Amino acid sequence: MIDNKVFCVHGGIPPPWMPGGGFISHLDTLSNDIKNPEDDEPLVWEYLWNDPWFSDFKNSLPPNTKIDDEGFVSNFRRGTGHLFTAKALDKFLNRNRLTHVIRAHEVKQNGFQVQHQNRLLTVFSSSKYCNGSNDSACVLIDNKKLRLLKLDTS
């Protein structure tokens, strides 16, 4: 958490029907020693594995799969967790009185990606990941402004 306004997470946000109802304060009640989060703490699993929804996924949705009223759908790309829409992110941010979510979890060619009305930042700080050609980036927060910095790692 940065300045009580920016939530940093590895993967994404959880659906509100998970334990804690989508309030990040519930994280304080969890153990620091979780051996098997998928089974022992499904909420932690969601924070680790959930991803943002992209509109081009619409053509890839498996048959009889739809986005629920809260803005979540099963993560058919990974086979675990959920995808969350801009609607889901907006509800999560409002519920927790936040302005932004910063996440990692996915390689981005430019090192970063801005989504969901500029309130979700995916930042990947490892350049040339797995011998790839991606750049790396980081976020600077100063005077309540977020700045994405692309890193020169040549």
List each model region and its residues.
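Feature recognizes metal-dependent phosphohydrolase scaffolds
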Residues: 1-154
